Amino acid sequence: MHPTRFTRKAPPTFSPIVRILFWLVSIALLLYGLACIALFIFQRSLIYVPQPNAFDTSASTRILPVPGADLVVSVRPHAGQKALIYLGGNAEDVSANLASFSSAFPNHALYLLHYRGYGGSSGKASEDALRADALALFDAVYAEHPDIAIVGRSLGTGVAIGLASQRPAARLVLVTPYNSIQEIAAQQFPYFPVRWLLTDKFESWRYAPKIRIPTLLLAAEFDEVIPRTSTERLNATFANGIASLVTIPGVGHNTISNAAQYLAAIRAAL
């Protein structure tokens, strides 16, 4: 008998078009992966845009020492029980509000927090750091003023609502609030797995059901940053009778504070 011969099969061949498609898909996946990595690494640079302190003087500034940072607080002292804590937007110099707030809220001591890295405050901003710093500011203010209103704007609404859920605030005002930053980021980056990449999610909806004080949600009619649906979803998570939603007509996300109704609405809520 003759031994069986094993024939060696030739490796499969692919047409030039298939090879080109393979390399194109591989390159696309590589670029997508690199984009995801870049988004993860630089996400806080997109969320936090520190601004210098352009309006304060030494008389209108206090330093609040906290673990890992010294925080600058723009202040307008006022004797009495009432105080207002302001937590601003992601690219806001909060000291710019001091003059107008002083006129609008003459019966409140004012404390406007410069986040870590903003307005001369040391340290680096993060959700955990901002929340801890807001608690520290509240505790320091509460020792002098037991009747505290908390006002948050844009990014600061997420900090403000968390603060109000953990401390005995008297009133809460949320200007251009969102349901969560994760929700906003997912809309801005629809082709990325934001849920898995984002570390600072600012999930305001988690805190809203815990709020038991009068709360005003102040929306801009033409808000180009925070969709109205996000604000409405947040409003729906409050307990019945706690929150009211007011829309200022004809203004956008960054111009809402220019409207005459802006300070009037906040003053009425206080």
Roles of regions detected by a PLM:
Residues 20, 24-65:
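An N-terminal hydrophobic leader/cap segment in hydrolases
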Residues 211, 217-223:
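Short beta-strand/loop motif that positions the catalytic acidic residue
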Residues 251-261:
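Catalytic histidine-centered segment of alpha/beta-hydrolase-like enzymes
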Residues 173-183, 200-204:
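Active-site nucleophile loop of the alpha/beta-hydrolase fold
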Residues 71-140, 157-158, 164:
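Membrane-embedded segments
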